[in-house]
């Protein structure tokens, strides 16, 4: 049958989607990045968002035969909360965990040390995918090198730097409509007998592989290759909106960016539509918030128009009639160099001399994200980067970049933005499990920072993938991770 064919894939940096094939979470995402129940069926939270009662799906087993139940969840909660393991993403997401209590075989109550209204969305993040208790007992190396979950596919082998192979789990609970509560997550004939994932960094090599038939699924497709692949009768190209947003950070604790008029001038000086055409080859959209439109509690605002004359007026009002010189730090990839040069050209039109300082990631991270000093003493003036709100909730797209407590080296507030009102709103958004109230709070945060401009929200990408034209059911989620629950090969 069609799904028994072995498939090979070229991937770049999409481990979250691959992990989701082998392991399910308590919650997950549908194709539109909306949260859906997976190994949980439902939950209740107290008003203070400090206690969450999770009801578990029955009739599920791990691929090693271990049953999925309350004991299995508690083993995973204990693992997430164990900071001695050094699981940076997991411990950051779950650093409010206190303990978990077994109510019955399929009910667990999780107690938090403080209010955390975004807890359920964090349980949909790849960092909280569920691992077999047997594998957890075997140690962290075993978990990292041979994951065992309840997923649609089972781990087979991993050769560092070369490939990872998985095979179909025909007993996956997602095929069973009764276990799923009425509607199966995947059709009975969906899936491939095995999949080999090959990380391929060079875009041209990935494109050649899909055209030659050496790979049957490829992501992500570089925008400059879209037309080429669309013109290939053996290849199908898919496209969807991304929740990732590209930013231009400005250090608000250093002159001249400690003046909001200067930051506003920067916003008017950059032509976002031109950015999409020049940098993204037309495959993008102008950002209207710090978070993508599919993110829970997104609130859009009108983009700043391209108005270089207004930018010059604002610079004059701020005391910089002749502009100024500043430095942009960024990872020196080909794509980032193109972005940096675009910004340099745009800002030169209003008298701002943007010196470019691209560097290797390790050096950049040490200088910027690893800086352990006050913002006024930090080396960074401006910084080029982006963010994907991978929990699907506005908290994760705002707090790491805006909270005073998120300044380096703690997190990603590279603008060194300090606003007591915003700090309190971010705390308020976590202090309740009422999603309507959280929506109001995060709308106010987004409106406030749109005026304060600690960073410029430039554009969002399109997620682009390609497959052999006899394969269907492949897609990319808004966070860029691969989705293949109903993927299959057409009958031959």
What label would you give each PLM region?
Residues 153, 285-317, 335-338:
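Structural transition elements
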